[in-house]
A protein has these predicted regions:
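Hydrophobic alpha-helical
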Residues: 1-37
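Sec-exported extracytoplasmic/periplasmic mature domains
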Residues: 12-20, 40-44, 64-68
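Structural detector of well-ordered beta-strand residues that form the stable sheet scaffold
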Residues: 25-27, 45, 88
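Short, charged, surface-exposed secondary-structure boundary motifs
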Residues: 35-39, 56-59
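Short beta-strand elements at the ligand-binding edges of bilobed clamshell
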Residues: 41-53
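Hinge/cleft segment of the Venus flytrap/periplasmic-binding protein
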Residues: 51-102
Length: 102
């Protein structure tokens, strides 16, 4: 099952209530604390990391620079600096720190 982190949290609850926990591979998108914890404990198979705090910080810096200097920063993709292209797995989950609770 693939979906946003919040949806995968619901799938975890539904599978658990149905007595089918662990019967599906769960892959989220967002990099929430719930996702990172789920990948760590094996409840989730993987997650595609999102970095909303980092993105917001970079955006604000670029905006202030543009206002002060009139210079555009161009496209900024914080995902290019993420380990393993942002794919969180059991093998690399320790490289990621959630930026939101989810």
């Amino acid at each position: 099952v693939v979906g946003p982190d919040q949806a995968i949290q619901g799938v975890v609850l539904a599978l658990s209530d149905a007595g089918k926990a662990g019967s599906a591979k769960l892959i989220g998108f967002g990099g929430s604390k719930a996702a990172i914890d789920g990948v760590k404990d094996g409840t989730w198979f993987a997650d595609l990391f999102g970095a909303p705090a980092t993105e917001g910080k970079l955006l604000m810096k670029a905006m202030v620079k543009a206002i002060k200097t009139g210079k555009k920063s161009g496209g900024i993709d914080p995902g290019t600096k993420l380990p393993d292209s942002g794919l969180v797995t059991k093998a690399n989950v320790s490289k990621f720190k959630a930026e939101w609770n989810g």
